């Protein structure tokens, strides 16, 4: 069975790293106030029938709380046991393997806007999907794998 692991900031939540670096560490509620990208309902629908997980890095505990508020608003169908919040710079694949006692394999897909996370995920045996947005790193950079501009592109593959 395919499993979809999704990042939040810059992937499904509108996060502009250039404008946020000074703010998110100081502004309470910063992450809770972020908007969602178009077609977020695709992820929410997939969460009803598929294994959908959230793996998002946070700078601090306040950001963790804010992200949980955001998730309850925009992705209420994601089971709370399928939400993992880690610290910036941690290897998402290793965190998931440890938390869920699973081995990342070719049926485990990470949707992320940050190529470093995708390379680490693939090195552990999973598959990566690069999220291209105008607010985040809109280039493929060194990433040569699957890339999407719109969340609706996931609908048929994971249906």
What are these regions (language model features)?
Residues 105-149:
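Acidic, Mg2+-coordinating phosphoryl-transfer loop and its flanking beta/alpha structural elements
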Residues 13-16, 61-65, 92-94, 117-120, ...:
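Short catalytic/ligand-binding loop motif for oxyanion handling, primarily in non-cytosolic enzymes
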């Amino acid at each position: 069975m395919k499993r979809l692991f999704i990042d939040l900031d810059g992937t499904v939540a509108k996060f502009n790293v250039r404008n946020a670096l000074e703010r998110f560490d100081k502004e309470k509620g910063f992450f809770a106030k972020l908007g969602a990208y178009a077609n977020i309902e695709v992820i929410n629908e997939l969460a009803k029938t598929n294994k959908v997980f959230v793996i998002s890095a946070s700078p601090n505990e306040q950001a963790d709380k804010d992200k949980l508020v955001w998730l309850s608003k925009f992705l209420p169908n994601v089971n709370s046991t399928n939400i993992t919040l880690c610290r910036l710079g941690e290897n998402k694949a290793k965190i998931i393997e440890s938390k869920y006692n699973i081995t990342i394999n070719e049926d485990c897909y990470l949707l992320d806007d940050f190529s470093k996370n995708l390379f680490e995920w693939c090195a552990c045996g999973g598959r990566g999907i690069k999220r291209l947005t105008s607010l985040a790193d809109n280039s493929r950079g060194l990433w040569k794998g699957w890339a999407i501009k719109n969340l609706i592109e996931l609908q048929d593959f994971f249906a």
